[in-house]
From Swiss-Prot:
Protein name: Ig kappa chain V region XP-1
Miscellaneous comment text of the record: Residues 24, 53 and 56 were not positively identified. This chain was obtained from antibody to p-azobenzoate and was isolated from the serum of a single rabbit.
Region (Complementarity-determining-3): 89-100
GO annotation terms (biological process): adaptive immune response
UniProt region (Framework-3), positions on chain: 57-88
Alphabetized PROSITE patterns for the sequence: IG_LIKE
SUPFAM superfamilies recorded: Immunoglobulin
Family annotation (Pfam families): V-set (PF07686)
Region Framework-2, residue ranges: 36-49
Domain of life: Eukaryota
UniProtKB keywords: Adaptive immunity, Immunity, Immunoglobulin
Region of interest (Complementarity-determining-1), ranges: 25-35
Species per Swiss-Prot/TrEMBL record: Oryctolagus cuniculus
């Protein structure tokens, strides 16, 4: 079955220096096979990969958590440059299921 990724909230506003948490829920367990991406950017900039490993050059202000079906992306000490659309993606999915992206 296809994996559906649902992100909440759809939008969030916090002051500079604050903290934001974005949630991502999978329609079935994906263990910890999740990545987070940031747009703008073509292709989208990878932030965190499986096991919550930070991509090269990404600030440690970004952190990930969760497993199974429920995941979070937390951005602390917010900066103006963090204003963007963030996407979760199920990775490492078996060949008989399509990978799912959150809605951003």
């Amino acid at each position: 079955a296809d994996i559906v990724m649902t992100q909440t909230p759809a939008s969030v506003s916090e002051p500079v220096g604050g903290t934001v948490t974005i949630k991502c829920q999978a329609s079935q367990s994906i263990f910890b096979b999740l990545a987070w991406y940031q747009k703008p950017g073509z292709p989208p900039k990878g932030l965190l990969y499986t096991b919550y490993t930070l991509a090269s050059g990404v600030s440690s202000r970004f952190s990930g958590g969760g497993s199974g079906t429920b995941f979070t992306l937390t951005i602390s000490d917010l900066e103006c440059a963090b204003a963007a659309t963030y996407y979760c993606e199920x990775t490492g999915v078996s060949z008989b299921x399509b990978k799912g992206f959150g809605g951003g």
